[in-house]
Amino acid sequence: ANAIKLLFRVLKEAVTNYEARLACVEGGSLRNAIPREASAVITIPKDSYDDVTDLVARFEDLFLAEYEGVETDLRLTAEEVDCPQQEIPEDVQDFLIHAVTLCPHGVYRVIPEQPDIVETSNNLAMISTNEKMVNDKKVNIIEVCCLTRSSVESRKEELQSVIQSAFSLAGADVTFSGSYPGWKPNLKSQLLHTLKETYHQQFGSEPRVVIIHAGLECGIIGRNYPNMEMISFGPTIEHPHSPDERVNIATVQKFYQFVLAALKAL
């Protein structure tokens, strides 16, 4: 579950039905990690306090039901804080809520020939409210960061255009940076064939060759050297790009042995 997406579902209803006003919002920590936490400071009329408290409880039950068996530790809470000194202008607040609600998150397209493999996706990764100097004035800036990936460059550009439209309609400035080019795998590669044979000779079993949906340096190298054959391999990593990320130590030694064997084979 994306904590930012869940939070904005609650915010949209609180603003629409209970006259809530948004003061600030924070969520996510890394662009390549699905946000696990998000929070917002809102103001509400005194007579809406019980209604908003009930709203939060209802949404927590709803989210637990929607993600049953997937997000067992999901929590949604509300607590009183000091009254904020200022609120986000109402029109900006409304545009922001609509844009984040509309912004795609998750799988956008799968590989047609391999429908269990993701081709194109977007991660609505971070949102923050920051005070910055603009033309010698302190202003509050709301920043939203996404990470779009695809093994097909044109599909990535299509999805980026969708995201740009959503936030441009909300009056936001949209920029793109740090793009990873797509890397389309070549399962008929001679390099892959050689290293599969090497692995079998080294360990007496067949390697598991899979396509993964991730940003790899191979995409950047392949853009500059389109005829270069490449594969990516390494030790077993569990829960990547999360606070629970860890490596299987036993596979590091195996990985090292395979690197030596691969260099000899080449």
Where are these regions (language model features)?
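His/Asp/Glu-rich mid-to-C-terminal helical/loop segments that flank catalytic regions of hydrolases
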Residues: 1-17, 46-49, 94-101, 109, ...
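Midchain, well-structured core segments that form catalytic/ion-binding scaffolds
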Residues: 1-148
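Short glycine/threonine-rich loop-to-helix capping motif typified by GTGT followed
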Residues: 31-39, 87, 91, 184-197, ...
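Zn-dependent metallopeptidase/amidohydrolase metal-coordination segment
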Residues: 112, 119-138, 147, 198-263
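Short, flexible active-site loops
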Residues: 140-150, 174-181
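C-terminal, non-catalytic macromolecule-binding modules
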Residues: 145-169
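Short, contiguous acidic/charged loop-to-helix segments that flank catalytic cores in large enzymes
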Residues: 149-154, 182-186, 246-247
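Generic long, charged, amphipathic alpha-helical segments
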Residues: 167-202
